Amino acid sequence: MVRARMATADKKPDSKGADAVAAAIARDIHAGEFGNGAWLKQVDIEGRYRCTRADARRALEALALKGAVQRIPQRGYYVTVIDERSHRELIEVRVILETATVPSIVEQATENDIADLKRLAERFAVSIRHGDAAEKYNANRAFHVRLTELCENRELVKLALDVRGHLPATPIAQWRSQARIERSCEEHFLMIDALAARDIARLKHLVAIHIRQPEDDDRLVPKSQS
């Protein structure tokens, strides 16, 4: 027993690789586990992600190069603060990129793709009633990644998903209220209906509404234009 306890205590962190650690940190930032401006201490990164000191350091350096975190010499790293202006500008960039994927999505989507999107939309619907912040984030992201990746233009897909990843995704930042979360859930199903109907104009309109979240979005959801 004593020998077993000593072996456990002496177990060294795994060398997972800096890329894997950086990806895990990025997921947690986007899920709201680390808020705007949160400090990321290297020792905490080592413990949380069970990684080596070298991997933790390289992961933070990689995230700093991408702009996800900032470094202050002699103090360390913190999550990049997205101010209101930057947030608005990123929203509009998302609208441009994601609506640009729509024609190809409509052209490429199969019945199996549509069925899979319905499954993911249902998963998000369950998460908004019973899930925590991370579950909501992961379910919502899974739906949007699946939808976006139907686009045949791989570079456009990469750009769209990269910009999506630059936005904070805490419930407070991503959805203004529980009513807005529920509305976003409804919009997922409306987008699937538009995709099934091969209605490019309607799907573009719904994608833009879904990203911008206008106050009068109920009025802005039109009937099919096909």
Go through the PLM ranges and name each one.
Residues A64-Q70, V163-G165, A179-E182:
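Mobile beta-alpha loop/short-helix "lid" or hinge segments that flank ligand
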Residues M1-E107, E149, R219-S226:
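Short linear motifs at protein or domain termini
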Residues L90, V102, E111-I172, E186-D193, ...:
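Conserved amphipathic alpha-helical segments that form helical-bundle/coiled-coil interaction surfaces
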Residues K16, I114-A115, A179-E182:
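Short helix-capping and inter-helix turn/linker motifs at the boundaries of alpha-helical repeat units
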Residues R48, R176-S226:
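C-terminal regulatory/effector modules of DNA-binding transcriptional regulators
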